[in-house]
Structures are given as C-alpha cells and as structure tokens.
C-alpha cells in the first residue's frame, strides 16, 4: 500500500494542472489499430496505425513499425497480468525502437524515430503500475525537433461473472524542444476488453492541456484502439 499512497498524489497533482482554465476547447475521436507478433521470448514486432493529437500536435495520422525487446518475465507480474493479452505486461523491462510516418491535412509530412523504455511493477491488491519513458525524434521540412514524454499507468483486473476487463488511469507530461518547456499534460481513463485469444479493445477518454502555443488549448478526445496479438511461440 505504500507504493499506492505514493502514486495517487502524483496523479491528483497532474489532474489539477491539466484542468487549469484555458481559452480554446476541442473534442476529437481517435481510432487506432495495433498488430503485434511475438517472435520469441525476447523479441516482438508490431505495426501501428492511428489518429492522434499527442503532445498538442494537430489532428494527424501516424503509421509505422516498432521492435520491442523483453527481459525475462516476473512471476508476480504474470499473476497480476494473467488476463491481459499483452504479454509485455509480464516483463519488468521492455525496450522499444520504432519509426512513424506522419501526415496531417494541409501540412508537410513528418518522420519520427521512437526510443522507449517501459518498467512494470506489481502492487498490492492486484494493482499494476507501468512507467514508460519515451523520446520522439522528429524531422519535418528538414527541421529537427525532439520531445520527452513520461507515461505513468495504473490498472487492475476486475471480473463480472466469468468475464475479465481491465480499467486503468494514466498521466503523461510532454517536454517539447521547440518550446523548451513542459508544454502538454495528457490524462487518460479507460478500460481494456479482451475478446478471445487474439483481440483486445482499448476504449478510453483523453484530456490534454496544451500550453506551448498562445492561447492555451484544452482538448478532450474519445479513443478506441483494436489490439491484435499473435505469436510464433508454441505454448
């Protein structure tokens, strides 16, 4: 419980910061499809296609592959993530490198390199904490920029009769090189819904507070991601 007491105040502070008064408000719907293929106990590849407004970006479409590298699974993590189809949740550390091609209406295309490290921690009472540190390296019109983002997620599996679903909350601040400050805070609340052995839906609400440009902008979005999971490993 000590870890939980340390985590919840942080989420509360980030929520208060994100809800400060702003002048402009928008709402969006963000569809996404991710297809994962586990190659062996160490490597997994996936292809992502999504609409997003991450870090205060305009509405845009991103597509591209990633490679993930796992460390060995932990028994405690496997217990709390038993009903989650994402096998990376059972690993203490997951490293990722990826590429995204990004397009937006009336804007030049953009390329992005992604480097990320995610640590997963089992908590008491069946809770699960995930800490993702990610760097985006962007090139647009031959101009380079970068941003750092740190996403903390807290989830727990619940059961209704024989069906298991996984509600979660998350917070992610962004540091943008073009503004030289922490310019965006994103808050998430949603749930994972496993369907069979290969499909898992992620339905969520996202609230963004963007302070990089003037006036500040507040964006609320509803998102729905379909995650597909396949494996070459024999179980």
Segments predicted by a language model, with ranges:
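Repeated loop/turn-to-beta-strand initiation elements of outer-membrane beta-barrel proteins
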Residues: 41-47, 74-78, 92-95, 124-129, ...
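Sec/Tat signal peptide C-region and signal peptidase I cleavage site
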Residues: 20-24
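Start-of-domain marker
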Residues: 25-90
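Membrane-embedded beta-strands of outer-membrane beta-barrel proteins
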Residues: 33, 63-65, 115-117, 150-154, ...
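Detector for outer-membrane/organellar transmembrane beta-barrel domains
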Residues: 120, 128-173
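Outer-membrane beta-barrel "beta-signal"
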Residues: 69-70, 74, 117, 218-235
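Transmembrane beta-strands of outer-membrane beta-barrel pores
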Residues: 41, 49-55, 99-105, 121, ...
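Residues that define the transmembrane beta-barrel architecture of outer-membrane proteins
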Residues: 27-29, 59-63, 109-113, 144-150, ...
